[in-house]
Each structure stands twice: as structure tokens, then as C-alpha cells.
């Protein structure tokens, strides 16, 4: 059996190149990723390879003969996978199942037979997965079924679980695939998400089968399938449902492979069988394996590079093939499980060296459970080294079982989503993981149980060997491979399954019972056939159950009385079945693989079909190990009754050489066997029920196992009678086997042609790769040139940016110069304006002086006229006085009249004073100037007119009058704002200081300005914003609102009058700021206020800059410079 390191460690220890990067994301080491390659290369890992092969990528994944392109194992299974060494087997199986298993192979393709063999060949992994998977597995039935369901239960337990994978993997084997599905369903639970990822990857990689197909090359794709399977088988304890598939993936891969791949499972089993049965067969298988391994390694190396991704897809397909092979082999390997385990152990030792290295890495990542299985195998092979590793792996198994539950869920998703590869991987992984989970419950202490299992495994191989020695040609050839596989697989599976069988023989008896239950769906037909088989072969149902249990419990059965009896019964069954395979191998190689695939479906339906398919799988393995087939023929002679039944089955297989003939014959034979085995299986069902109880109670398991051993002994007696009948049938089967061998040779030739075609395709692929590399190099050169151009462009852009910066600097300098020029121009313009203003003022003063002079001249003329009039009046008065003198009385009266006249003049002068009061009202100088001549005009009334003004002039000195008359302001001149508007605002100490009507605006501006409104002691007052409009009231509220530490508004003022008298007056307010940014923000604040308050008037604004800072730093200075634009420069 495979060295303890077989799975991960042998792969690692082998140091086989871990080329597979895609093997599993979970792979703890790149080596595990290469498990597939290492597994193929390493014989140590026979068990691991069996489990790994079936589960992971191993020969089982390789077995996808149908798709040589998909898998390197697509080549004759022996060629593609070192464990495949039995090429003849692949040739018979490939006739029908190969292509479907190739694409669908792992789970659904011809994997229907695979499930039985699968648990056996994966015995380590599958037995673990079936039995360990059973307790931890989602359903004990599914877990128990996988051995049974692997033969028959696959449709039953795995049909509910796996149907999607089967549908995905192989529509032809969809019934088979549905059985994988349950493990996949369970496997998603147990599988870690990483396992699902690796499974998905392997699905992707598996499509490129050729690279993955080579188990020997173990192109990372090939090994990754094992990794997936091993990881899945280990990780998904649910795999127990699929454990058959998990086993199938290792062994089951061979059935789907069986055309080419069956050599892997069979090769793994047949080399072990050859070693146990015929060493020469093993040597031949090993030699074929070594040759194919070298070829596959080349292909794998090529395909690994080109097809690592494909390898994943191929792995998924290989896993499908493995599962299909597992189904076929599970059927046959349940019977041939011991043989296949031994053969698979030997083939797996080689393949495990290659595959186990890859699978070990993959399995380690995939499942520490598989590591436990590997360690169990290693414990058998390297019990001491592996016991420690098993301790670790036992812990890992528990962790992996948890991961497996997650992975089972993930795989359910993957199987639903990920198609065949994931399902098969999940199934195998679930089987493997169910095995580890079951191993954990049953291996609860994997180390202890492993040693126990190793002991029982060793004992079982010993028991099996004695039992095999009793039927040694039967069992040694069959069970020694099976024991080797069981011992390897049983070490792995028996360690888990010895854990399980010992712990789970009740549990596996329950699985057997559950398997009948699981078989009931899967074996419900089989059980119906079992009753039939129990009638004809109740020993075989027990044998099948034991064999199925042996896939699950072959270790336990071999380990325990049931194992001994089923081992004997299995040898009996395996002898006829192996005789049938021998006879049926030529006939059944094509039909058997087809039949195995169909029989897997039927055997999933029927236990005997499972057994027969196990026989067929064993036959495939026997076909791979033709020498073992001789041993099996000897066993067949011993099991002539079974062989006769198997001869009938072989005749049925001959009738159904196209899958259905053999299946029908096998169904008929199996129905006969079912009649015999219905009693046996009824007994076994009772035993399995006892085993289920024993799964609950290990002690009951032992008692039930003893009972089962007794029943099996009875059945063996019945089987001995049947063996005599089978011996007759075996002779017929031998003839059929010869025909099958011829067909196998033809298939081998076809496989060789396919290999040559594959090589040509690989060469073409290499050429394409080289061309692609050249194109890539050219692209890289172009990219480098583009990068250089980009760098040059960047440099040019940088230079342009520098030039732009320089231009900007020049522009800034120009702008500064322009600003300076503008300032100078402004200064010049202001100076000119001031000069013009001064000149205008001087002119106005001169005009005023001239006007005053003219007025004075006019006044002088008026005074002269008045003097003349006064002189004339005096003359008249003198004349009157003379007359008065002449007439004294008259003279007195005249004097009185003169005195009366003087007051009139005075009154007139007073009226003239009133006129002076009227002058201010009559604001025009013209009226003032025209009034004296108007007075002068009425000379007739000297008293009212001229006398008034004259006296007015006399009494008001002319120099004073011009000052009064200088007020020449027109009526329409703009008036200054009312004094209440002109009061400069005082800074507010608190908000209440702000007038109530201006307070909302003040608060709004304070929030808007924020920090900008605060006083900055470092800044000076050099900026202002001038707001102007026609509403002095709104401007007053604005000036009251803009009162902050860094923003201060002056009082309301008015702009200079534009010119025409009737133009409206424009009022303004200056808001002084400390910097330009604040002044801009003040403008924005007013615009924001106007936007939110439609009734507020729209004010125009402009920013003003001062050369010299304004003295606004002291808070005490309440200056409102806003009213004087002179402050602006």
C-alpha cells in the first residue's frame, strides 16, 4: 500500500514537481497542487492515489478516455494515468463510456459503475468518504449508500444529490451523475470554499483534458483533478453519498477512464491485484504506467503550461470521468475493491508517487481528511510517519470536515453552478470529506482508529489474505488489490472506515442498511434485485453490501467478520465477477465500461449490478491487470456460482456489450443474484440496520458484524453453491473475455491513434503557443516603443508646461507693468482732474467776480439816477420852500408833508429789506439782477420803486449784497442725504446694538462671511466695496448691517450729479475691507441676500483699492470716509 505520505505527503515526499498551480486554491503547498502528478508518480500513495485518483485528479480523473483532448488520460487510460496501466480495460470501457466520461466522465459518465468501485478504489478516500462521510455526511443513507450507492446507491443517494452534476457531466450517465450530485450536495457542505474554487478551476482546467489526462505526466491539470477529488473527497464528508464517486473519482475515474481511464482505477487496483494476485500483471501495469507516465508527463508538462487552466477543466472532466469511473468501479470495486485497492495501491503507488505528490499537495490543501486517509495509507505504508501526520490530519480532518460542510454547500452551489467538474470534484471531495468526517466520528481519534484501522486493515488484509487465501485467488487477487486498495484505501478508508467500519461497521452496516436504504433508492431497485439477488445471491448482496460496505466497509468487513465474510463473499462474487470481468472484459471492456456505466446506473439501481459493475470495474482493473484477471479467474473458479451468475451476467453483458445487453444480462443475473441476494441482502439489510444501530453503537456494530459474518458465512456457503454455477458461467465469460480482450486490443490501437492525434494536437498547440509568444514579444516591443513615445510626449509636455509657466510669468510681469502703468495713468488722470477742477473753480470765481463787478456797476448807475432824482426833488423842495417863505403857512404845511414822505421812503426801504428776504426764495441771480431795473423803470412813482431800492441799496452796502446774492444753486440740484443718513455707524459691541430692522441682514452677513469678517491685526485697510443705488433707505440698512471687525461700512453718501438738472440722485455706501478676497466675499454676500430677499433692491457694486491704508485700525475712530470719494486713489 501507498506509503503513509501517499496523498499529500507522498506527493510531497516524492518531490514530484508540483507544476499544478491550479490544482487547488486550498492547496497548502504548491506540491499539493501537483498532487495529481505526484500521485501518478508515487506508488506509496496507492491508497491515496485510489482515493486521490478517484477523488482528485489521479488516474481516475485521467480515465476520461472519451475525451483525449480533455484529458491526457483521454489517451488509453493506462497511458494517460500511470495507475491506468491496464490499457485493455480502458479499451473495453472507452468504446461507449469513454467520450461521455471524458467530458462528463468524473461523475456521470460511466461513473454509474464507478460508485461501487469508487468507494473501494478510493477505499482509503472513498471508504473514508463513504463511511466517514456517512456519519458526518449530510445523510447516513447517502454516506452509507456511496459504497452501496456507489455501486447501486449512486442513483439512489447520489441521484438526489448529484443529479445536477450528472446532468452537467454526462447526460448519458445523468442517472449516475445524480448520485454524484448528492455527494456534491453534501460535498458543498463539507467542501471548503477553497475546494469548490479548486473544483471550479478544475472544471475549467479539465476541459483541456489532454493536459490533465496524463496522470503520470500529472500535468498540473491532471494532478489538480485529483487534488480536487482528493480535496473534495477528503473535504466533503457528504462525499459519502458521493464517496463512491470519490472513490470513483480515484477508481471511478478509471471507469470513466476505464476505456482509457479504467486502467487508472483498475490500473490502480489491477496493479495491486497483479501484485496481490499476479505480480507480473502489476509489473506489466507498472511498466505501462511508467511509459504512459513519461508520455503523460511530457503531455502534462506541455499541457500543464498550456492547459493548467484547461487542466482544471480537465480535472473537472477527469473528476467526472473519475466519478463515472468511480461509479463503474464503485460497482465493480465494491466487489473488487480489495483487488482494486491492492491494484490501485500498486498503480497508485506509481500514480500516487506522481499523483499523490500532486494529489498530496492538492489533497493536503483539498483535505486534511485526505491527508488522514493518506496518512492512513501512509500508516499502512508509513504507519509510524503517518500516524503523526494522521494526528495532524485528524485535526485537519475535523477542520476539513467543517470546511467540507462549507465546501459541500459551496459544491452544491458549484455543482449547480459549476457543472460537471465541480460536481464530480464536490462529489469526490464530499465522499472524501464524508469519509474524513465519518473518519472523524468513526476515526474520532484518527490516529488511534487509524492504528486500529491499520491493524484491522493489516489484519483485514491478513484476514482478507487468509480469506483471500481461503479464496485467496479470489480475494488475494481481488481483495489483495482490494485489501491493498482497502488496505491502502482501507488504510485510508479502513483507517477512516476501520474507524468507520469498526466504528461504522454498525454505521456501515447502517450504511449497508442505509445503503440498502440508500440502495433502496439506489438499491431499491437493487434491493428489489437484492431480494432477487438475495434469493439467488443473498450471499452476494451481503457480499455486495459487504462489498459495497467493503467500499465503505470492505475495510470494516475485512476488518470485522462482515469484512471477512464479505471478503470471502466478495472473493466469491469478485471471483465470478472477476471471472466475469475476465470473460466479460473482452466483451465488457467496451460494454462493461458501457455496461459498467449503465450497470452503474443499473447497479446503482441494483447492488449486483453494482457488484457486477464492481466486477466490471474490477474486470476493467482485471483487464488492466489481465494477470489479476487470471487470479480473478481462479477466484472465479472458486466463485463459480457467482461466476455462473456472472457468466449469466457476462452473457447479459455480451447481449448488452453495448452497455444495455450486459446491463440487461447483469440485471437478469443480478435479479437472480438479487433473488438469492435479496435474502442475503435482506439479511444484510438487517445487518445493515444492525450496522446503523452499530453506527449509533459501535458495540452493536461488532455484534452485528459478527452476525453478518455468520450470515456471510452462510451466504458464502450459498455462494459456494452459486460459485459452482458461476464456474460454468465463468467458462462462458472467459470466452467473452477473450472477445473483450480482442476488442480491448482494438481499443488500445484506437487509443494509440488518439494518443498520436493528441500528440499532433499538442505539437500544433506548442507551435501556436510559440507563435503566440512571438506575437506577445512583438506586442511587448510595440508596447515598449509606445512607452518610449509616451515618455517623449511627457517630456515634450513638461517642456511645454515649463514654457507655459514662463509665459505665465511673463504675462504676470506684463500685468504688473500694466497695473503700474494704469496706476500711473490713474494718478495722472486724477491730477489732471484736480487741475481741471481747480481751473473750473478759478473760472467760476472769475465769472462770479465779473458778475459782481457788473452788479456793482449797475448799482452805481442806479444810485446815480437816484441821486439825480433826489436832486430834482430837492430843487422842487427848494422852490416850494421859497413859496413857503413867501407864504409861511404854506411853508409849514409843506414841511409836514416832507416829513410824511420820509417815512414812506423808509417804508419803501423796509419793503426792499423784505425783498432781500425774498432773494433766498428767488434763488436765481437773474431775478436779483433784474429786480433793480424793474424798480427803476417806474420813475413816475419815485417813492414806491426807485426810492425803495435806492434806499435799500443805501442801507445795504453793495459789498455785502454780493455775498447774499452768491447763492446761485438751481432748484433741481441733488440734495445731500438727510442728516440722519449721514451719521457714521459705530461698531457694535453686541448684537442688540444693531438696529432692529438691519439685524436680520447683519446676522446673514455674519454667517456668510464667517472668518473673513473678523479683524486681522496684520492686515491694513486698503480695499473697499462701493454700493450705489437710488434708495437711500436700503443703503442705510446695508451700512448698518456691514459692521464687523474686518468689514466696516461708511454712512450713506451720494455720487456727484451727472449733469442735467432733472436727473435722479444716486446714493452710495462704501464698505471697507482688509483684503481683496474679503471684498469679493462682501459682494457675494449682498448678491446672496438679494437672491433670498426679492424685495431688497438690486444694488450695483464695485471693488476699490487704496494706495495708502485707511486709518480704520482704531475702533474709536468712527470715520465714514465713504461720503468722500477723495479717499479713493
UniProtKB/Swiss-Prot annotation:
Residues 1-988, 1110-1129 are annotated as: Disordered. One of its GO terms (cellular component) is host cell nucleus. Residues 1008-1129 are annotated as: DNA-binding domain. It comes from the Viruses. It is found in: Host nucleus. The keyword DNA-binding applies. Residues 186-197, 263-275, 431-471, 529-596 have a biased composition (Low complexity). The keyword DNA-binding applies. Residues 28-41, 48-58, 292-301, 314-323, 472-528 have a biased composition (Basic and acidic residues). Residues 85-104, 161-185 have a biased composition (Pro residues). GO terms for molecular function: DNA binding; transcription coactivator activity. One of its GO terms (biological process) is positive regulation of transcription by RNA polymerase II. Pfam families: LANA1_DNA-bd. Keywords: DNA-binding, Host nucleus, Host-virus interaction, Inhibition of host NF-kappa-B by virus. Its main location: host cell. Residues 962-979 have a biased composition (Basic residues). Homooligomer. Interacts with host BRD2. Interacts with host RELA, ELOB, ELOC and CUL5; these interactions induce the proteasomal degradation of host RELA. Interacts with host TRIM28 and NFE2L2/NRF2; these interactions are essential for the shutdown of lytic gene expression during the early stage of infection. Interacts (via N-terminus) with host histones H2A and H2B; these interactions are essential to dock LANA1 onto chromosomes. Interacts with host BUB1 and PCNA. Interacts with host NAP1L1; this interaction is required for LANA1-dependent DNA replication. Multifunctional protein that plays a role in the replication and long-term persistence of the viral episomal genome in dividing cells. Binds to mitotic chromosomes via its N-terminal region and to a 16-bp imperfect palindrome within the origin of replication (oriP) located in the viral terminal repeat (TR) through its C-terminal. Tethers viral episomes to chromosomes during mitosis. Plays a critical role in the shutdown of lytic gene expression during the early stage of infection by interacting with host TRIM28. This is Protein LANA1. It comes from Human herpesvirus 8 type P (isolate GK18) (HHV-8). The lineage of its organism: Viruses, Duplodnaviria, Heunggongvirae, Peploviricota, Herviviricetes. The gene is LANA1.
Amino acid at each position: 500500500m501507498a506509503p503513509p505520505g501517499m496523498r499529500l505527503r507522498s506527493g510531497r515526499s516524492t518531490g514530484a514537481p508540483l507544476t499544478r498551480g491550479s490544482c487547488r486554491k486550498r492547496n497548502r503547498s504548491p506540491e499539493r497542487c501537483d498532487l495529481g502528478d505526484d500521485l501518478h508518480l508515487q506508488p506509496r500513495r496507492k491508497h491515496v492515489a485510489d482515493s486521490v485518483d478517484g477523488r482528485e485528479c489521479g488516474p481516475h480523473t485521467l480515465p476520461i478516455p472519451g475525451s483525449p483532448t480533455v484529458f491526457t488520460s483521454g489517451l488509453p487510460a493506462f497511458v494517460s494515468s500511470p495507475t491506468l496501466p491496464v490499457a485493455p480495460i480502458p479499451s473495453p470501457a472507452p468504446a461507449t463510456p469513454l467520450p461521455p466520461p471524458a467530458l462528463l466522465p468524473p461523475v456521470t459518465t460511466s461513473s454509474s459503475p464507478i460508485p461501487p468501485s469508487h468507494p473501494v478504489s478510493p477505499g482509503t478516500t472513498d471508504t473514508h468518504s463513504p463511511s466517514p462521510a456517512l456519519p458526518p455526511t449530510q445523510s447516513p443513507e447517502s454516506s452509507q449508500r456511496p459504497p452501496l450507492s456507489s455501486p447501486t446507491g449512486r442513483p439512489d443517494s447520489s441521484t438526489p444529490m448529484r443529479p445536477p452534476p450528472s446532468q452537467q457531466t454526462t447526460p448519458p450517465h445523468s442517472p449516475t451523475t445524480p448520485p454524484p450530485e448528492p455527494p456534491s450536495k453534501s460535498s458543498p457542505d463539507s467542501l471548503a470554499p477553497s475546494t469548490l474554487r479548486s473544483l471550479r478551476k478544475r472544471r475549467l482546467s479539465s476541459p483541456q483534458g489532454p493536459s490533465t489526462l496524463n496522470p503520470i505526466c500529472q500535468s498540473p491539470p491532471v494532478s489538480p483533478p485529483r487534488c480536487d477529488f482528493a480535496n473534495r473527497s477528503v473535504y466533503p464528508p457528504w462525499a459519502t453519498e458521493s464517496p463512491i464517486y470519490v472513490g470513483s473519482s480515484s477508481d471511478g475515474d478509471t471507469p470513466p477512464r476505464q476505456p482509457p481511464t479504467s486502467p487508472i482505477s483498475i490500473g490502480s487496483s489491477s496493479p495491486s491485484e497483479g501484485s496481490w494476485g499476479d505480480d507480473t500483471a502489476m509489473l506489466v501495469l507498472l511498466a505501462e504506467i511508467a511509459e504512459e507516465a513519461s508520455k503523460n508527463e511530457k503531455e502534462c508538462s506541455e499541457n500543464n503550461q498550456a492547459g493548467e487552466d484547461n487542466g482544471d477543466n480537465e480535472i473537472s472532466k477527469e473528476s467526472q470521468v473519475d466519478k463515472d469511473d468511480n461509479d463503474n468501479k464503485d460497482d465493480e470495486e465494491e466487489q473488487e475493491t480489495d483487488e482494486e485497492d491492492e491494484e490501485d495501491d500498486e498503480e497508485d503507488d506509481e500514480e500516487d508517487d506522481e499523483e499523490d505528490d500532486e494529489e498530496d499537495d492538492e489533497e493536503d490543501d483539498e483535505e486534511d481528511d485526505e491527508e488522514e486517509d493518506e496518512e492512513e495509507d501512509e500508516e499502512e505504508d508509513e504507519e509510524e510517519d503517518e500516524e503523526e501526520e494522521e494526528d495532524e490530519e485528524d485535526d485537519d480532518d475535523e477542520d476539513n470536515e467543517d470546511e467540507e460542510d462549507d465546501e459541500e454547500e459551496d459544491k452544491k452551489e458549484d455543482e449547480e453552478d459549476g457543472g460537471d467538474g465541480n460536481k464530480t470534484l464536490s462529489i469526490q471531495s464530499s465522499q472524501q470529506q464524508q469519509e474524513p468526517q465519518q473518519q472523524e466520528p468513526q476515526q474520532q481519534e484518527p490516529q488511534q482508529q487509524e492504528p486500529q484501522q491499520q491493524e484491522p486493515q493489516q489484519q483485514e488484509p491478513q484476514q482478507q489474505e487468509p480469506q483471500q487465501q481461503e479464496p485467496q485467488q479470489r480475494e488475494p487477487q481481488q481483495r489483495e488489490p482490494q485489501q491493498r486498495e482497502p488496505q491502502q484505501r482501507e488504510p485510508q478508508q479502513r483507517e477512516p472506515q476501520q474507524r468507520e467500519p469498526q466504528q461504522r461497521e454498525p454505521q456501515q452496516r447502517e450504511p449497508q442498511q442505509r445503503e440498502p436504504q440508500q440502495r433502496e433508492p439506489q438499491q431499491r431497485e437493487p434491493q428489489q434485485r437484492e431480494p432477487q439477488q438475495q434469493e439467488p445471491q443473498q450471499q452476494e448482496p451481503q457480499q455486495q453490501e459487504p462489498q459495497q460496505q467493503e467500499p465503505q466497509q470492505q475495510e470494516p468487513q475485512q476488518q470485522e467478520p462482515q469484512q471477512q465474510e464479505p471478503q470471502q463473499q466478495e472473493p466469491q462474487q469478485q471471483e465470478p465477477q472477476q471471472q466475469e470481468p475476465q470473460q466479460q472484459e473482452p466483451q465488457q471492456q467496451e460494454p462493461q465500461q458501457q455496461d459498467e456505466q449503465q450497470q452503474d446506473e443499473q447497479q446503482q439501481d441494483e447492488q449486483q449490478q453494482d457488484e457486477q459493475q464492481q466486477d466490471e470495474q474490477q474486470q476493467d482493473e482485471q483487464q488492466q491487470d489481465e494477470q489479476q484477471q487470471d487470479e480473478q479467474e481462479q477466484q472465479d473458479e472458486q466463485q463459480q456460482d457467482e461466476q455462473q451468475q456472472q457468466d449469466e451476467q457476462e452473457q447479459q453483458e455480451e447481449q448488452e456489450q453495448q452497455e444495455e445487453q450486459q446491463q440487461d444480462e447483469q440485471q437478469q443475473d443480478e435479479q437472480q443474484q438479487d433473488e438469492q441476494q435479496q435474502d442475503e441482502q435482506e439479511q444484510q439489510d438487517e445487518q445493515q440496520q444492525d450496522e446503523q444501530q452499530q453506527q449509533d453503537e459501535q458495540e452493536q456494530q461488532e455484534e452485528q458484524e459478527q452476525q453478518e459474518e455468520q450470515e456471510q458465512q452462510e451466504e458464502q456457503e450459498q455462494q459456494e453453491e452459486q460459485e459452482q454455477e458461476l464456474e460454468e458461467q465463468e467458462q462462458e465469460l472467459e470466452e467473452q473475455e477473450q472477445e473483450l480482450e480482442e476488442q480491448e486490443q482494438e481499443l488500445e490501437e484506437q487509443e494509440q491513434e488518439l494518443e498520436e492525434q493528441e500528440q499532433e494536437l499538442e505539437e500544433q498547440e506548442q507551435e501556436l503557443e510559440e507563435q503566440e509568444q512571438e506575437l506577445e514579444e512583438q506586442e511587448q516591443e510595440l508596447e515598449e516603443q509606445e512607452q518610449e513615445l509616451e515618455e517623449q510626449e511627457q517630456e515634450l509636455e513638461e517642456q511645454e508646461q515649463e514654457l507655459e509657466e514662463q509665459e505665465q510669468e511673463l504675462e504676470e510681469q506684463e500685468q504688473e507693468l500694466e497695473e503700474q502703468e494704469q496706476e500711473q495713468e490713474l494718478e495722472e488722470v486724477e491730477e489732471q482732474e484736480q487741475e481741471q477742477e481747480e481751473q473750473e473753480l478759478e473760472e467760476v470765481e472769475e465769472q462770479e467776480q465779473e458778475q459782481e463787478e457788473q452788479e456793482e456797476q449797475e448799482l452805481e448807475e442806479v444810485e446815480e439816477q437816484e441821486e439825480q432824482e433826489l436832486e430834482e426833488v430837492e430843487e422842487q423842495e427848494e422852490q416850494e420852500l421859497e413859496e413857503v417863505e413867501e407864504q409861511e403857512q404854506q411853508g409849514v404845511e409843506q414841511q409836514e408833508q416832507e416829513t410824511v414822505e420820509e417815512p414812506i421812503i423808509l417804508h419803501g426801504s423796509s419793503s426792499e429789506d423784505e425783498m432781500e428776504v425774498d432773494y433766498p426764495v428767488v434763488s436765481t441771480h437773474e431775478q436779483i439782477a433784474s429786480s433793480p431795473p424793474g424798480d427803476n423803470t417806474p420813475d413816475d412813482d419815485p417813492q414806491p420803486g426807485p426810492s425803495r431800492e435806492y434806499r435799500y441799496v443805501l442801507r445795504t452796502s453793495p459789498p455785502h449784497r454780493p455775498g447774499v446774492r452768491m447763492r446761485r444753486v438751481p432748484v433741481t440740484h441733488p440734495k445731500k442725504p438727510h442728516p440722519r443718513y449721514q451719521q457714521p455707524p459705530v461698531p457694535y459691541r453686541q448684537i442688540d446694538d444693531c438696529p432692529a430692522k438691519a439685524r436680520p441682514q447683519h446676522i446673514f452677513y455674519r454667517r456668510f462671511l464667517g472668518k473673513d469678517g473678523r479683524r486681522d491685526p496684520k492686515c491694513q485697510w486698503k480695499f473697499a466695496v462701493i454700493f450705489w443705488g437710488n434708495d437711500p433707505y436700503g443703503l442705510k440698512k446695508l451700512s448698518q448691517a456691514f459692521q464687523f471687525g474686518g468689514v466696516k461700512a461708511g454712512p450713506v453718501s451720494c455720487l456727484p450729479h451727472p449733469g442735467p438738472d432733472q436727473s435722479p440722485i444716486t446714493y452710495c455706501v462704501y464698505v471697507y475691507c482688509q483684503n481683496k478676497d474679503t471684498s469679493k466675499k462682501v459682494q457675494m454676500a449682498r448678491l446672496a441676500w438679494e437672491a433670498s430677499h426679492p424685495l431688497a433692491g438690486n444694488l450695483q457694486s464695485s471693488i476699490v483699492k487704496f494706495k495708502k491704508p485707511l486709518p480704520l485700525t482704531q475702533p474709536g475712530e468712527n470715520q465714514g470716509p465713504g461720503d468722500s470719494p477723495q479717499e479713493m486713489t
